[in-house]
């Protein structure tokens, strides 16, 4: 990441600004962090300064400047046909890196840029508060205060202002201290009282007029009412050309390191092999062939045959064997299939079919069926060892202030979200690139896991009992209208999701992985769709191409997984918060959990795909007391010898 060494002050009509050249190494981030926590538009404390990660379209320039052809090399592009189809892009692009050591898994980024942000800094010696290029002097680090002359590292402002449309700027200290009026030429100072550590101890003082005001109350919902958003997008640079005009959203004061400054929006897919025509598989592996065909398809037949045959030996063989007409028909069918609507539901259904379809030895999808323990055959149809998988993770955008999609808001949030600009951001999030690109930021993750397919006959029997009881009717009614949770909710989903959490908590006690390192994918029949699903994938993944070490896969051995399942059920019967937990139907966000709390079923947020919602231990183990008689899934079959352990 970098910013320029030499400052060049330029005058604008209403402010001074600074331009930079000659990149300076500012700090280091892991490649996966740039796709998740610290993606384009995120504010991050780097080694050299506090900065905002630059727009992703700058990655393209970095790649093109690194080779004589001035284009992104094919080796840098990440392909996953299903995810490309879903998101409407041609490929995914990882942050440009260099290996620090051939024998090391560490990678250093050379071409991911960051701009210094926030602009407002203060001198720890005299307290002067101003934009850093006016306040400090120095070759590139602004270590000398122009006001007091003392050499100190300037400290970036703790506060920023942002709106739900993604715009972010310096907190308006001048406007704040003058209570709604901006006095451009007034000089500000900041001081800290030692009376407490709260916001009331931070005092903003105007040297020019003598007014002062503490920061107490600046974080309240209406603190910046009357302050108009300027549409600033500093991750695109300081030029006003990247500002968005006429934003009507209210501004909110945030602390620059707070989680609500940046919520990344991630989409991912597992790379699964397809039982496809070998010609279509060739086009999957070499997407540049389709691009070439589209460019030359109107040329004369002789010229087209020569051009296509020259670029790829396999394609030349097809032309020789089947002729140009047959090959053109294949190209057209492949192209038409790529233009069909493809949904996230279909993507999950394709993944589910791949896990249920038998053993596979594909380089990115190596699975092996493991025998289901005899005691658990009424409940599980299949248990699969996932020796290797590849997950393509893409950053599709980000949000500020609120994490939910504008359409997912509950009644308390509706007022804030009325100003979200759907015209500019139709998907409900801010895109990672300011300039339109044909790609999205993405990375490959490799790992291992275990897949559990439930017995559909037992599941249907349990679901019918629970549905008749109406146990989850209130849970469904509490889900925000139009939200992702509403789109997946069903009685089986609650069971599968809870089972997944309980299994992860138990497996981490047996295999040494932490809960945060294991993720879940729930495969449950989507409401309104014909395809039936009932499965859970637990997996771990990392950017290392060799994946992980096999510890999780080993848990799928028949004798080991039998022990894990027995212990899981034993643990699930009791919670340290019982009887309050087991009797509860109003826990968690929006009361979307029943018998599930931190002591028994909740996981780190990185592990859960539904924000630790839609959980209920009773779905797994049942509950029988004077207040209710509710059957759990694992009570519907004969556990045989397993029952002796309970």
Each PLM stretch: what is its role?
Residues 2-177, 187-193, 242-646:
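Extended, well-ordered protein cores
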């Amino acid at each position: 990441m970098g910013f320029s060494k030499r400052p060049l002050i330029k005058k604008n009509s209403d402010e001074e600004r600074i331009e930079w050249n000659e990149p300076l190494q500012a700090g280091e981030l892991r490649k996966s962090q740039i796709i998740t926590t610290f993606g384009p538009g995120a504010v991050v404390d780097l080694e050299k300064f506090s900065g905002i990660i630059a727009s992703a379209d700058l990655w393209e320039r970095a790649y093109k400047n690194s080779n004589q052809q001035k284009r992104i090399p094919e080796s840098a592009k990440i392909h996953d046909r299903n995810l490309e189809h879903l998101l409407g892009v041609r490929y995914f692009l990882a942050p440009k890196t260099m290996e620090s050591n051939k024998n090391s898994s560490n990678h250093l980024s050379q071409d991911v840029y960051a701009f210094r942000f926030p602009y407002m800094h203060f001198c720890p010696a005299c307290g002067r508060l101003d934009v850093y290029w006016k306040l400090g002097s120095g070759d590139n680090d602004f270590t000398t205060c122009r006001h007091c002359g003392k050499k100190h590292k300037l400290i970036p402002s703790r506060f920023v202002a942002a709106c739900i449309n993604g715009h972010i700027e310096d907190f308006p200290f001048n406007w704040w201290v003058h209570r709604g009026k901006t006095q451009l030429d007034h000089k500000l100072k900041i001081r800290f009282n030692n009376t407490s550590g709260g916001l009331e101890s931070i005092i903003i003082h105007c040297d020019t007029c003598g007014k002062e005001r503490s920061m107490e109350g600046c974080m309240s919902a209406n603190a910046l009412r009357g302050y108009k958003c300027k549409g600033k997008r500093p991750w695109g640079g300081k030029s006003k050309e990247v500002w968005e005009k006429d934003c009507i959203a209210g501004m909110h004061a945030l602390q620059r390191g707070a989680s609500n400054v940046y919520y990344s929006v991630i989409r991912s897919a597992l790379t699964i092999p397809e039982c496809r025509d070998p010609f279509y598989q060739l086009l999957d592996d070499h997407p540049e062939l389709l691009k070439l065909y589209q460019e030359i398809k109107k040329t004369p037949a002789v010229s087209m045959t020569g051009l296509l045959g020259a670029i790829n030996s396999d394609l030349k063989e097809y032309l020789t064997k089947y002729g140009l007409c047959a090959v053109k028909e294949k190209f057209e069918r492949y192209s038409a299939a790529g233009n069909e609507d493809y949904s996230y539901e279909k993507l999950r259904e394709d993944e589910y079919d791949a896990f249920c379809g038998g053993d596979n030895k594909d380089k990115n999808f190596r699975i092996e069926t493991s025998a289901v323990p005899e005691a658990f055959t009424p409940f599980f149809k299949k248990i699969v060892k996932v020796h290797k998988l590849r997950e393509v993770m893409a950053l599709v955008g980000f949000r500020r202030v609120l994490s939910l999609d504008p359409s997912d808001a509950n009644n308390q949030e509706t007022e804030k979200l009325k100003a979200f600009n759907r015209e500019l951001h139709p998907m409900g999030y801010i895109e990672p690139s300011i300039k339109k690109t044909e790609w999205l930021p993405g990375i490959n993750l490799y790992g291992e896991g275990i897949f559990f397919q439930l017995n559909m006959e037992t599941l249907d029997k349990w679901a019918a009992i629970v549905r008749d009881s109406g146990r989850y009717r209130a849970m469904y009614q509490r889900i925000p209208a139009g939200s992702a949770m509403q789109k997946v909710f069903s009685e089986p989903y609650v069971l599968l999701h809870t089972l997944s959490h309980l299994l992860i908590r138990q497996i981490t006690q047996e295999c040494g992985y932490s809960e945060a390192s294991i993720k879940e994918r729930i495969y449950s029949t989507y409401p309104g769709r014909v395809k039936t699903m009932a499965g859970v994938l637990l997996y771990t993944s990392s950017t290392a191409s060799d994946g992980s070490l096999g510890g999780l896969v080993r848990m799928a051995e028949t004798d080991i997984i039998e022990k894990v399942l027995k212990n899981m059920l034993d643990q699930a019967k009791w919670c340290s918060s019982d009887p309050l937990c087991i009797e509860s139907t109003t826990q968690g966000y929006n009361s979307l959990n029943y018998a599930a709390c931190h002591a028994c079923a909740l996981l780190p947020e990185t592990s859960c795909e539904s924000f630790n919602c839609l959980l209920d231990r009773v779905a797994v183990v049942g509950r029988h007391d004077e207040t209710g008689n509710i059957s759990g899934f694992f009570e519907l079959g004969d556990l045989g010898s397993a029952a002796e352990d309970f």
